[in-house]
Amino acid sequence: MLYAFGERDAEARRLADFTCTALQLVNFWQDLATDWAKGRVYLPQEDLRRFAYTEEELSRGEVNGRFRELMRFEAARTREFFDRGLPLADRLRGAARLDVRLFSRGGMRVLDLVERAGYDVFRRRPTLSKLGKARLALETVLGIGP
């Protein structure tokens, strides 16, 4: 995608990797329940072990203290990827700059929703409302926020 925007240097690719990784991670956390139902688990095994949260608990959609700590850790790591990728937008022009900012901000907003739900992504999939999307787009176009 960077090539379509005219960016071909290694630094732009590095920044894009951070942004794309963050967006993919948000999607994983947002879709834990639906992915489990499809036989997919994207939580790293080492992190499950570190926080003593089992796949059996995951299969039941159990949100306990260990799960919240695990997801707090994953959310913090995801935010770091977003933060490291944010300078990419400043390297781009026009619609490309807006697109990257919009996607990054959208991902960060979904991550906010995951956190506000106490990391309980099993009862309700965190998504932006139509109003939330409109507000996000307006803020991005007007340059309000990060």
Placement of each model-derived feature along the sequence:
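Catalytic cores of Mg2+-dependent Asp-rich isoprenoid enzymes
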Residues: L2-A22, T34-P146
